[in-house]
């Protein structure tokens, strides 16, 4: 009689364990879903290049310009590339060119800043502007700041401007 009661209890306990173990397996198999998601990344994300706008990557190069005249013909292109190797070496190059012909009143305003931490840093800016004959009154204000911690620092700025005959009044301010 005791064996019979013990056997029934053992059988009931074993059956309960099997049932409890099967519930998660059933839930897993019923609730299993496959999530396949695809994302497309727009070209140029990570580094943003906009003419007359902002190039931003690990370090920040910012330029802002405003040109207003009676008639304006302009084209510009720019490229920005940066390579980081390890934690101590940073190599950055920024090149851009713009060509425009303008007649009338022109106002150019630009500001840029470059801040880096690395072994070598270099900043180069080239500006070219040609203007058609006429009366030109231009105000150009440029402010730049360059702060770096590293071993070598080089900054080069080239500005070229050619104009056809005419009357021109220009004020240029440069602060570093």
Swiss-Prot record:
It comes from the Bacteria. The keyword Cell inner membrane does not apply. It is found in: Cell membrane. Sequence repeats lie at residues 123-135, 155-167, 168-176. A lipid is attached at residue 30 (N-palmitoyl cysteine). Residues 123-176 are annotated as: 2.5 X 13 AA repeats. Keywords: Cell membrane, Lipoprotein, Membrane, Palmitate, Repeat, Signal. Residues 35-121, 143-153 have a biased composition (Low complexity). It is a lipid-anchor. Residues 33-176 are annotated as: Disordered. Residues 1-29 form the signal peptide. A lipid is attached at residue 30 (S-diacylglycerol cysteine). GO terms for cellular component: plasma membrane. Residues 126-142, 158-176 have a biased composition (Polar residues). InterPro entries: VlpA-F-like_signal, VlpA_N. Transmembrane segments: none annotated. Responsible for the antigenic diversity for host adaptation. The numbers of repeats can vary and is one of the basis of the antigenic diversity. This is Variant surface antigen A. It comes from Mesomycoplasma hyorhinis.
